[in-house]
Amino acid sequence: MRVAALISGGKDSCYNMMQCIAAGHQIVALANLRPAENQVGSDELDSYMYQTVGHHAIDLYAEAMALPLYRRTIRGRSLDTRQVYTKCEGDEVEDLYELLKLVKEKEEVEGISVGAILSDYQRIRVENVCKRLNLQPLAYLWQRNQEDLLREMISSNIQAMIIKVAALGLDPDKHLGKTLDQMEPYLIELSKKYGVHVCGEGGEYETFTLDCPLFKKKIIVDSSEVVIHSADAFAPVAYLRFLELHLEDKVSSVPDNYRTSNYIYNF
């Protein structure tokens, strides 16, 4: 099946792409929703649906994968927050509809790779959009054990770094910029102590993927800065803002059903 992957830049959307390919599907394009460039606080958009931290590096992510990238600016807000979503003009979900509608027209995809693990809110809305467009959502991580998933991601050579923290026990000065393999023991410890979701499904942290077996080049962070979003004494919210990045060549093979062709479509 020809598949487009919804990506945030994080580990989950990346690992779900790997699962799609393992299942015999072909990733032919990437799709991403981003905040408006002139929007105040655009690095960390208050959205129920989308991860926006790290969005400045998404173009480089697509270049690393050598795949076409479709990006749409998020124009809507979270208006219909009921359990069952229905089409609602001005809702941010309709931005996803317009994005995937274009991707389907341009790339003739039949399925959408989705990295959802636990959020019914996100799953229901993605399924609503896919049903309206006659697309098949592919969510191989859905309701998987999070400790198992994190272990698999690390053993599958997904190199992702923590770019946002927002939970008790996560310190911006200590943990931002750390990689998954460096954080795994501590995340498991936090899960046992405070009930933190090991994969960050409660919004405890977010990641950005620097390398994985699907990348033809790896992303190198040359410089970044810490931005404090909320200086809570017990659970401060902070994120990394990338300042300089570049791609570095790597010697690796990609699966036979993985085809590459890079261009970016913004609207």
Curated annotation (Swiss-Prot):
Any one GO CC term of the record: cytosol
Record-listed E.C. numbers: 6.3.1.14
The keyword Phosphoprotein appears for this protein: yes
Annotated catalysed reactions: diphthine-[translation elongation factor 2] + NH4(+) + ATP = diphthamide-[translation elongation factor 2] + AMP + diphosphate + H(+)
The keyword ATP-binding is annotated on this UniProt entry: yes
Keywords assigned by UniProt, alphabetized: ATP-binding, Ligase, Nucleotide-binding, Phosphoprotein
Entry-annotated residues carrying Phosphotyrosine: Y97
Function: Amidase that may catalyze the last step of diphthamide biosynthesis using ammonium and ATP. Diphthamide biosynthesis consists in the conversion of an L-histidine residue in the translation elongation factor (EEF2) to diphthamide.
Family: Belongs to the Diphthine--ammonia ligase family.
Protein name: Diphthine--ammonia ligase
Species: Homo sapiens (Human)
